[in-house]
Amino acid sequence: MPTPSMEDYIEKIYSLIETKGYARVSDIADELFVHPSSVTKMVQKLDKDEYLIYEKYRGLILTPKGTQMGKRLLERHALLESFLSIIGVDPSHIYHDVEGIEHHLSWNSIDRIGDVVQFFENHPDALKTLKAMETTKPETKE
């Protein structure tokens, strides 16, 4: 199992490849706000663990294992964003909240959250009822 840090890299690499068609060390460093040397070190570890194939100065490609994991991680992130939006979390907090919880939930929990999201997507009246339950509370300091 990849560590939370490895998951962040795999997710970002997958996302870059999906949007740009490639992922360079410099692109990954820019996206994750880390030094290129940190990316190189992690990419070498991900290569060793067979999530990707890395050749110095030539770039990297995800293996089928890495592609499958990257897709699942990106879907997990999007699902958690949807869930937090459905339950009424302030949009300005959603990204940060997802980053804070995504590595601490089991895949079983993620699947159950997916069921809840799907339920509300398929039952707009239930979603209206949930939204009606939301109360305005003063913002709490974090």
Curated annotation (Swiss-Prot):
Domain of life: Bacteria
DNA damage recorded as keyword: no
Keyword Repressor: yes
Primary location recorded for the protein, binned into one broad class: cytoplasm
Annotated localization: Cytoplasm
Amino acids binding Mn(2+) 2: E11, H77, E99, E102
Pfam families given in the database record: Fe_dep_repr_C, Fe_dep_repress
Single GO BP term: intracellular manganese ion homeostasis
GO cellular component: cytoplasm
InterPro entries: DtxR_MntR_Metal-Reg (IPR050536), Fe_dep_repressor (IPR001367), Fe_dep_repressor_sf (IPR036421), HTH_DTXR (IPR022687), HTH_tscrpt_reg_MntR (IPR022897), Iron_dep_repressor (IPR022689), WH-like_DNA-bd_sf (IPR036388), WH_DNA-bd_sf (IPR036390)
Chain positions recorded as Mn(2+) 1 binding sites: D8, E99, E102, H103
Domain HTH dtxR-type: 1-63
Keywords: Activator, Cytoplasm, DNA-binding, Manganese, Metal-binding, Repressor, Transcription, Transcription regulation
Activity regulation details: DNA binding is strongly activated by Mn(2+).
Cross-referenced SMART domains: HTH_DTXR
A GO molecular-function annotation: DNA binding
Function: Central regulator of manganese homeostasis.
Assembly: Homodimer.
Family annotation (PANTHER family): IRON (METAL) DEPENDENT REPRESSOR, DTXR FAMILY, TRANSCRIPTIONAL REGULATOR MNTR
Record protein name field: HTH-type transcriptional regulator MntR
Originating species: Listeria monocytogenes serovar 1/2a (strain ATCC BAA-679 / EGD-e)
Origin organism lineage: Bacteria, Bacillati, Bacillota, Bacilli, Bacillales
UniProt gene name: mntR
